[in-house]
Amino acid sequence: MKYYKKIEIDYYDDVIADTLSYLKNHKPDIYNRTINATYYPLDVNEFKQFCPKLDLAFARYNIVCDFVVAFVMKTNSDAALHVDNYGRGDTRINLPILNTKGSRTIFYTGGIFKEYINPITKVSSNRLISGEGLKKVDDVEIDQCTVIRVNEPHMITMNVNNSPRITLTLGFNKDPVFLLEE
């Protein structure tokens, strides 16, 4: 199974700069992580007003972004081993926004997981409760636009001296899993 693929997008630098500006200037609670969460769903239409080239960036793949999350980490415990409860497909596309150099998304097989719902954001994921049969199978540094399998067990490690670590995780009108197969 292929767990990730780095891809090229148009207007990459514009999307990164617009995202960082949006988070700093319009979502300081998220940028500064004053809310006790790492996964912040954003209003897609509002986000696109501040990041007007987002849809153009993915036009070559014939996909339209309809789900935007800012993922903000301060420590390695912020993204312990988990499986996303993403019901709209197997993959999303992640973009590095800030301080991602040297961080890794590590994929596993095995393990036993239990649903967890963040009491603040109401977002659910499956957290590891037993390492039975757990085996590392792959890893990637999110240093460019990357398709990742979010519904497979994974965790993120970061350089805690470079905080916050921010990525954007995007969903689309059709699952970009087809990009893993190209």
Where are these regions (language model features)?
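Non-catalytic surface loops within mature trypsin-like serine protease
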Residues: 11-13, 74, 97-99, 172-174
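Catalytic core of Fe(II)/2-oxoglutarate
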Residues: 117-182
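A short, structural micro-pattern
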Residues: 64, 89, 162-164
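Intrinsic-disorder/low-complexity, polar/charged segments enriched in Ser/Thr/Lys/Arg/Asp/Glu/Gln
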Residues: 2-6, 90-92, 167
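Short acidic, gly/pro-rich beta-turn/loop elements at beta-sheet edges
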Residues: 15, 80, 103-105, 177-180
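Non-heme Fe(II)/2-oxoglutarate
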Residues: 1-64, 68-69, 78
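Catalytic core of non-heme Fe(II) oxygenases with the double-stranded beta-helix
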Residues: 67-69, 73-145
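Compositionally biased, intrinsically disordered low-complexity segments enriched
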Residues: 7-10, 84, 97, 156
